[in-house]
Every structure is written in structure tokens, then in C-alpha cells.
Amino acid sequence: MIVTKVIEVIGSSETGSDDAVREALAAAQRSIRGITSVEVCQVTCTVEDGGISRWEALVKIYFPVEPR
């Protein structure tokens, strides 16, 4: 049986939602091995002067838990 752990991470970018998701994944990869999937749960934007100034992506990161 494989046990999978799920964490939530928020990534942000000034250039787009794809980059915000990639930033969240990169942040998780700094401390987690074996990430198997990413689920994008929510994308939000900050608007300044009539345009989008920042994108944020809330993602779920899935990875297996190794047996002890």
C-alpha cells in the first residue's frame, strides 16, 4: 500500500498563473522528494492601475510517504 501526503502551497508571480504554479512547485521541491502531482485549486490576481500586477496560485502537492 502506498500512502500519499498532500500539502497546500501558494506560489506567486508577476508574469502569469503558470509561473505562479511553477514557483509553488519549486518551493515544495526544495524540501520534498518524489512529488507525483500538483493540483491547481485556485488562482487569484491583484489588480493595480487597471491591470493585473500579481498572480497567486493555491496548489495541492502530492507525494508518497516512505515507510519507516
Locate each region found by the language model.
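Compositionally biased, disordered extreme N-termini, encompassing classical targeting presequences
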Residues: 1-2, 68
